């Protein structure tokens, strides 16, 4: 090591020179220029990889998250959103800097909250890479697209998780979906309708905004995953560039995550569809955005039809035509 360090320093100094000067000093100018160009490229490290998972509430997101968390070397953060108006609102949050800041005597704006979130995530991402693991972030998309902040014809006036992360990371993202009628019925049952008007049409309109925002992102259907879990996990691992999917179903029972409110039991299997109340059935006649949403995601809008047409995995959803 004693002799290697001076030689390394000499090489670094040599490659730090201007390519033209370096070429003049070496017998092979082309090689010298190539070395200098390689050094210049190496001085700009590539953005680290970060995986992200996006879905609406009551679409099987926790099942997907638990399955991914069961993979070896995965560290999963469940339901993250630094701007969420939901959840614990008390002043006592000794471990949560964002909650402390919002409950403090001079609450900061979105820009500061974003920097707090990004700094904490950067530390955790770096530690995960150092340990040889893969960090997966489960976005709480419901907080963005299904709260009163999202009123109006466009997107909410706040950054999305994608916008918060894409400058610092090479994002590998996946959107997961479920039949919109089934997820809407579950949302009603959980009393999680946090927007106005609280109608199926408004829900579908917001769903379109979500899909528009994550256009070109691969989509996996909940129904496809529950029908063929091993094939679905192989697809997830391909999209997110994760390894070691074998045996994930046996390991996922040990995972405990937030958002685990709808599904009971540990087996991955399709569940019976809920009955459609008369009030919701009446809404189906006046919800054109719902019909377009079903067509966009490859579902039959008829509540008497099959929940899933049988296609294994859907590609990116085309923009809403309505």
Functional labels for PLM-detected ranges:
Residues 1-130, 138-140, 249-307, ...:
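PAPS-dependent sulfotransferase catalytic core
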Residues 305-322:
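C-terminal non-catalytic accessory extensions
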Residues 79, 247-250:
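A short, aromatic/hydrophobic, helix- or strand-capping loop or linear motif
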Residues 72, 240-241, 297:
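A broad structural signal for alpha-helix termini and local helix breaks/kinks
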Residues 91-97, 234-235, 261-268:
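Short, surface-exposed amphipathic charged segments that create phosphate/polyanion-binding patches used
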Residues 61, 110-118, 157-158, 200-204, ...:
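A structural signal for well-ordered alpha-helical scaffolds and beta->alpha junctions
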Residues 134, 139-247:
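PAPS-dependent sulfotransferase catalytic domain
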């Amino acid at each position: 090591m004693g002799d290697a360090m001076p030689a390394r320093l000499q090489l670094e100094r040599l490659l730090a020179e201007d390519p033209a000067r370096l070429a003049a000093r070496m017998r092979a100018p082309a090689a010298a220029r190539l070395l200098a160009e390689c050094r210049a490229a190496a001085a700009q490290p590539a953005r680290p990889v970060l995986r992200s998972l996006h879905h609406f509430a009551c679409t099987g997101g926790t099942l997907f998250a638990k399955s991914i968390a069961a993979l070896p070397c995965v560290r999963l953060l469940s339901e993250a959103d630094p701007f969420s108006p939901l959840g614990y609102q008390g002043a006592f949050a000794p471990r949560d800097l964002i909650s402390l800041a919002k409950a403090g005597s001079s609450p900061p704006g979105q820009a500061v909250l974003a920097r707090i979130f990004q700094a904490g995530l950067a530390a955790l991402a770096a530690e995960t890479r150092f340990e040889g693991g893969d960090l997966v972030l489960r976005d709480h998309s419901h907080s963005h697209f299904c709260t009163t902040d999202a009123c109006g014809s466009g997107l909410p006036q706040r950054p999305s998780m994608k916008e918060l992360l894409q400058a610092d990371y090479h994002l590998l993202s996946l959107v997961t979906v479920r039949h919109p009628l089934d997820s809407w019925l579950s949302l009603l049952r959980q009393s999680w309708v946090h927007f106005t008007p609280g109608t199926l049409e408004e829900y579908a309109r917001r769903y379109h905004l979500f899909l528009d925002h994550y256009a070109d992102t691969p989509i996996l259907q909940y129904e496809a995953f529950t029908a063929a879990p091993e094939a679905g996990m192989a697809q997830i691992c391909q999209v997110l560039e994760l390894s070691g999917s074998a045996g994930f179903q046996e390991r996922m029972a040990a995972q405990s995550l937030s958002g685990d409110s709808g599904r009971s039991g540990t087996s991955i299997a399709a569940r019976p569809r809920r009955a459609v109340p008369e009030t919701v059935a009446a809404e189906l006649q006046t919800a054109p955005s719902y019909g377009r949403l079903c067509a966009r995601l490859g579902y039959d809008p008829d509540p008497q039809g099959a929940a899933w047409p049988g296609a294994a995995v859907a590609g990116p959803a085309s923009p809403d035509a309505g």
